[in-house]
Amino acid sequence: MENKFTPFIGIEYIKFGSDRSDVNISINSDSEVFTRNEIAENSTDYYKDLGFFVEYDSNNKCEAIEFTKDSGLLYEGRNLFDLSYSKLRTIYDSISNEMEEEDKLGCTYHDLGFAVSKSTEDDNIESVLIFSKNYWR
């Protein structure tokens, strides 16, 4: 499934700020609930069959969605997983005014609303995180 995303808004059927119960209803698929790390404000829902994770803030509102290479994510007509990491950087580094490289593991485009994790073994994209305006604050 290819998911079209709009920066700081979400995808067609999951909008940032949506309540967890509304997200679960709109997805209508089984999820695994777990806590990602010790600094997480809330648990995360992993939809393995769909290839993405949904993160929630302390008020159970959707604040980010992380897509794995098992899913599709369209931005401006491009499936980001069809691009190599270096090609993605060539395209979006020239557009973004707020790109932050993260220890050669990936980068975040704060002004475009997404972050990319790359493989340490090759130039492939491992995951893409799309986020709400307040996610990094």
What do these predicted regions represent?
Residues 1-137:
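Short helix/turn-capping signatures at newly exposed starts of structured segments
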